[in-house]
Regions:
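Enrichment for repetitive, rod-forming helical segments
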Residues: 10-12, 548
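N-terminal maturation segment of proteins
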Residues: 111-703
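C-terminal motif of bacterial Sec signal peptides marking the signal peptidase cleavage site
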Residues: 18-22
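Intrinsically disordered, low-complexity repeat and linker tracts
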Residues: 25-117
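Bacterial Sec-dependent N-terminal signal peptides
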Residues: 1-10
């Protein structure tokens, strides 16, 4: 999915970031349908400000809260150099639960670090080292003996069972991936239909880490010799996912449920709308799940207060206000309520009798009006009793344990094994190169420059389905073939249209993947729709999913979420689409460079502010000193307040683009292959950390 980046504009041959303090960070091109903590892997992947979900590769940043993720889709880390791995311990570094003083920017939670072993980079270094271990060294580290009796066919069964177990954790997990549960021997009636819990205790973290260690030991018992190339790839992928997950249990689970990025209620209408109704039984299961929503809502105040009291991470007043705006919409007692209108639209699309349709609509409306709305109204009143709400959220690294969490978050977003400082320096160098190129082009071709500044250009297609057809025709010859698949553009019901969503790709259910759907918000401004259709459709996420499937991927691979890989690819083709729009090549390059620089600058500021503790002086030095932009110290204070609540928001889009671009170009040069061949080799691997991509790119997966 796509996210809208920090606004950038070309002025007098020098790029200038436009009024950052007025930039709405959540005003994205599109947004993932599900950014909730329960399932960061949404089934729908919108073009948005966020992170992706199972909505194709992406939604909000596709990261999960430690303690809530499926074991097959762990989290990710990032930081300092990679020394020899330290012995794995059972105890998480999370401090004991305490009740801190009120959290404010001046007193951000239970004691800012660093302390010995906390917020000093050593935790990230430890996990980077574990991620890079060979299978043999990993066995020594975890005290595991190879079981030579296990064969390749046993590993196949292991991977199949792993997938089934991971999606059988709850009804909400299962419907993200499976159309026919019976074909996987999943008893739907026995599933957990609840929406999960709203907070994670220290005990939960310890239990979660112990469980992950047991999964690591189980994996490492399988011999690597004798496996097929695809099996070896999945072996490495899953080991990485598990180490990342263990790291996630070793950091404090900072979460802000009133933050638009983490808000558990903001996308609930779209999430429920994407539940597939193939038969009447699906509607009945939907009702069973819907009826548990009030219990989750009732627990929310406790979860928010627990987060504040034990981790010192509190929402601010503006978030509370925005959250209450969402509650107003959800409490709408008319038929235009998103939980009623969206459901009615789904029922109208079913092949059932008029009597059954009427019955289902009435039952849904009754649940919403008599159970969910009263629970939401009671919750709204409970919000008044929450203590510790701040005037402004402080940068993540200013909280005790915050830097360790941020290191983990960045690796979870990027899967590249680079420290915060390394990523920041890397992006700074990219910005310098892009700005120099931009200035050079603008000086040589002022007509192209003014055409861009004045918006004096038009894309060759403006309707979503027309754009996808155009891109298939024009970009198709230079990219891997999509194959003989069915796809369609479908529009959200009017009542579900949201400002934050432009479009998203709905990842097909794995046992019924014939139809690929790109969901579009017809009420959104169509600016950027051309690139968004490339990002979500062809040659973006839709091609990504189908090439991985064609390469013989295992079901469980679809539960792995490496946003640096998936969003990096989607951003690459999003920008490449401009080259096929019929523009003067200099105008096309100016459009691309401005977009790249805008994303990169915001990512750099995020890394500096939330990761390294930049204050107004450091922000000023970067924007006014390094880049030569006109910003005051007061402006820079405003930038910090804008970015502090959204750690890691754009990093997978910004840095992911550059790493994917470098990976493909490097492979072309080293192997003397075409761009199309390099893209196919990249996409056949599927979601993976970049060191795994480098290891397996070009492998023959038929062997």
């Amino acid at each position: 999915m796509t996210k809208k980046r920090f606004t950038a504009a070309v002025l007098a041959g020098i790029l200038a970031v436009s009024s950052i303090t007025g930039c709405n960070l959540m005003d994205t091109q599109s947004t993932t349908a599900d950014d909730s903590d329960d399932e960061t892997k949404e089934k729908t992947q919108p073009a948005t400000d966020e992170p992706e979900s199972k909505t194709q590769e992406g939604g909000e940043p596709d990261t999960k809260e430690p303690g809530t993720e499926d074991i097959s889709t762990p989290e990710v880390p990032s930081d300092e150099e990679t020394p020899t791995a330290e012995p794995v311990t059972d105890e998480p570094t999370t401090p004991e639960e305490t009740t801190p003083e009120e959290t404010t920017p001046e007193n951000p939670g239970p004691g800012p670090g660093p302390e010995v072993g906390i917020d000093d980079g050593s935790l990230a270094a430890k996990y980077f080292a574990l991620m890079q271990l060979s299978v043999e060294d990993a066995r020594k580290e975890f005290g595991v003996e190879e079981d030579k009796s296990l064969k390749a066919e046993d590993f196949d069964k292991y991977l199949y069972d792993l997938f089934v177990d991971s999606v059988s954790g709850s009804y909400l997990s299962m419907i993200e991936y499976v159309d026919d549960p019976a074909s996987f021997d999943i008893d739907v009636d026995s599933l957990d239909f609840t929406w999960g819990h709203t907070y994670t205790t220290a005990e939960d973290l310890k239990e979660g880490k112990d469980e992950v260690k047991s999964y690591i030991e189980e994996l490492l018992a399988y011999p690597i010799d004798g496996l097929s190339n695809r099996q070896k790839l999945v072996y490495d992928k899953y080991y990485y996912e598990l180490i990342l997950s263990m790291w996630g249990y070793d950091v404090m689970p900072f979460s802000n449920y009133l933050n638009p990025r983490d808000d558990v209620l903001s996308n609930i209408g779209i999430r429920l709308y994407e539940v597939v109704f193939d038969e009447k039984k699906d509607v009945e299961y939907y009702f069973e799940c819907l009826k548990t929503l009030p219990d989750f809502i009732e627990e929310l105040p406790e979860g928010i207060q627990y987060q504040i009291d034990n981790y010192g991470y509190a929402p601010d007043e503006s978030m509370l206000e925005s959250h209450r705006d969402i509650l107003v919409q959800l409490c709408d007692d008319t038929d235009e309520n998103v939980l009623i209108a969206g459901f009615d639209a789904k029922i109208d699309a079913m092949d059932i009798s008029a009597d059954d349709a009427k019955k289902y609509k009435e039952e849904n409306a009754k649940i919403v009006r008599e159970e969910i709305i009263p629970a939401l109204k009671a919750y709204d009143k409970e919000l008044d009793g929450i203590t510790g709400i701040t005037d402004a959220v402080a940068p993540m690294c200013s909280y005790k344990g915050g830097r360790d969490y941020y290191d983990y978050l960045i690796e979870a977003e990027m899967s590249c094994g680079m420290s915060v400082q390394e990523l920041l320096d890397y992006l700074k160098a990219e910005v310098d190169d892009c700005e120099n190129e931009l200035i050079s082009i603008a000086q040589k071709d002022m007509d192209a420059y003014y055409a861009y500044v004045d918006g004096d250009f038009e894309y060759p297609a403006t309707e979503a389905d027309e754009i996808v057809k155009y891109l298939l025709e024009k970009m198709g010859p230079n990219y891997p073939e999509l194959g003989n698949i069915d796809w369609k553009v479908a529009y959200l019901p009017k009542v579900l249209e949201q400002d934050g969503i432009l479009a998203y790709y709905i990842t097909p259910l794995l046992d019924n993947d014939k139809l690929n759907v790109i969901r579009v918000n017809g009420g959104a401004n169509d600016t950027g729709l051309f690139g968004t259709m490339a990002h979500e459709g062809f040659p973006g996420h839709m091609l990504q999913f189908n090439i991985q499937k064609r390469a013989g991927s295992y079901y469980v691979e679809n539960t792995f979420t490496e946003l640096g890989y998936s969003e990096g690819w989607a951003m690459l083709v999003d920008r490449d689409a401009v080259n096929y729009a019929g523009f003067n090549k200099n105008l096309a390059r100016i459009i691309q460079l401005d977009d790249i620089i805008g994303y990169d600058i915001e990512a750099i500021l995020d890394l500096g502010i939330n990761g390294l503790g930049w204050g107004a002086d450091e922000v000023y030095d970067f924007l006014s000193g390094d880049l030569g932009y006109s910003y005051s110290k007061e402006d820079c204070e405003g930038i910090i307040m804008e970015l502090a609540p959204y750690p890691g928001n754009l990093i997978s889009y910004a840095a992911g683009y550059h790493l994917v671009d470098e990976t493909i170009k490097g492979y072309m040069e080293e192997n003397d292959v075409t761009y199309k061949e390099a893209c196919e080799a990249f996409l056949e691997i599927g979601n993976a950390a970049f060191h795994i991509v480098a290891k397996y790119m070009g492998t023959d997966f038929t062997k």
